[in-house]
């Protein structure tokens, strides 16, 4: 029986697992039932299972043969604070939470690969199956690393995969170098002197200073970053005042910036600091600037050459050369798998969730993972393990 036929038999199981996880979404560091479900499945496959890294993380270990080669495969588990608007039977049962980024599918594909590999054992070495919490803005990968992930599971390399709605169903996209941008937040607090709206001359208007600052911030990329280097700075929140006839004392601005190099990241941070200081001084406004006040920023997701070559070989074996884009445009989105790639060589790859006009973008209340790609993704994981570790002697 061929690999694809075997995975097709697993397909119905993976669909059941995926839709179960979709019905019961759990957000960052609260994935207790999700982790238990995954751990129970891994144990039933005969894997050694460790729980608790990164609070709710799960790692399954499968060793075959006598080789000391090791590979780690990672899937994320967490959902988002989004109210699902789908009406199908497996829609979210948790109000205000849903799997709008496909992490239910990522977990199901990795579980399918774990089951197949545990039953067929056609490799020589050790596979670590990492199920990570809190990818969505809470840096769960970093927390697992801090808790000793790679000390306890000393892999040679680490690999990740994410569904992508803009790619045709079951095709892949991967390349060496930057795949996802770095991500940093900032918060600016401007403090002036409150006054009656009819008497602005008696106060210092923090709203006026904030307006000038917002406009100036948009010059950072357009007039300071080399046009050949992609970057974006966005103001995403403005908080000030509570009534019609008073100029408030305080304005709070929040935003993000994203790019693909440390040099550009440093330049943006420096220019932000410069603008905040000088514009607010010019308006006689006090100001503070804080970077990443709630969570760690994410580094660039950067694929290393040898590991990308392995991922590319596996993807081509699954989808054919015509089914693999080897020069995709990097995404301005961000991914905390980047923390793992700072610790170990590895590769992050996209699998197509479907590019038709009926497919939803990620983080959309109508999104649903495409179950058609479950067997394709699991097959990619299996091929990657067999290529990287080789057959047992």
Residue ranges and their predicted role:
Residues 2-99, 108-123:
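Acidic/His- and Gly-rich active-site-bordering loop/insert found
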Residues 21, 60, 73, 103, ...:
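Divalent metal-coordination and catalytic microenvironments
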Residues 24, 201-208, 263-269:
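Active-site pocket-shaping loop/turn-to-helix segments
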Residues 26, 76-78, 134, 164, ...:
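Active-site beta-loop-alpha junctions enriched in small/polar residues
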Residues 59, 80-82, 86-98, 104-105, ...:
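Histidine/acidic-residue-rich, glycine-tolerant segments that coordinate divalent metal ions
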Residues 72-74, 186-188, 348-353:
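Non-cysteine beta-strand/loop elements that form the S-adenosyl-L-methionine
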Residues 211-393:
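Metal-dependent amide/peptide-bond hydrolase catalytic core
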């Amino acid at each position: 029986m061929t690999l694809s036929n075997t995975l097709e038999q697993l397909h119905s199981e993976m669909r059941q697992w995926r839709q179960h996880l979709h019905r019961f979404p759990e957000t960052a560091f609260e994935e207790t039932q999700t982790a238990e479900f995954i751990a129970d499945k891994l144990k039933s496959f005969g894997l050694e299972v460790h729980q608790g890294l990164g609070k709710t993380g799960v790692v399954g270990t499968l060793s075959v043969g006598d080789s000391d080669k090791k590979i780690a495969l990672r899937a994320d588990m967490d959902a988002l604070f989004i109210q699902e608007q789908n009406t199908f039977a497996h829609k979210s049962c948790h109000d205000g939470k849903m799997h709008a980024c496909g992490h239910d599918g990522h977990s199901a594909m990795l579980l399918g690969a774990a089951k197949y590999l545990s039953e067929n054992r056609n490799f020589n070495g050790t596979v670590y199956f990492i199920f990570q919490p809190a990818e969505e803005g809470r840096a769960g990968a970093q927390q697992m690393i801090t808790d000793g992930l790679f000390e306890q599971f000393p892999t040679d390399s680490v690999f990740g995969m994410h569904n992508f709605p803009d790619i045709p169903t079951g095709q892949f996209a991967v390349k060496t170098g930057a795949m996802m941008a770095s991500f940093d937040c900032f918060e600016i607090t401007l403090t002036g002197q409150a006054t009656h709206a009819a008497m602005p001359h008696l106060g210092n208007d923090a709203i006026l200073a904030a307006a000038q600052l917002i406009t100036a911030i948009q010059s950072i990329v357009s007039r300071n970053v080399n046009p050949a280097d992609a970057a974006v700075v966005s103001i995403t929140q403005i908080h000030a005042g509570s009534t019609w006839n008073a100029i408030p004392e305080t304005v709070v601005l929040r935003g993000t910036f994203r790019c693909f190099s440390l040099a550009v990241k440093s330049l943006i941070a420096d220019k932000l600091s410069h603008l905040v200081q000088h514009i607010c001084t010019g308006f006689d406004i006090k100001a503070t600037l804080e970077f990443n006040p709630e969570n760690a920023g994410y580094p660039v997701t950067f694929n290393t050459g040898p590991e990308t070559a392995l991922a590319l070989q596996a993807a081509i074996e699954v989808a054919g050369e015509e089914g693999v884009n080897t020069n995709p445009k990097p995404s301005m989105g961000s991914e905390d798998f980047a923390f793992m790639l700072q610790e170990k060589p590895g590769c992050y790859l996209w699998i197509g969730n479907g590019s038709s006009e009926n497919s939803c973008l990620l983080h959309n209340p109508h999104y649903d993972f495409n179950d058609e790609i479950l067997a394709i993704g699991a097959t990619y994981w299996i091929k990657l393990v067999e290529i990287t570790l080789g057959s047992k002697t």
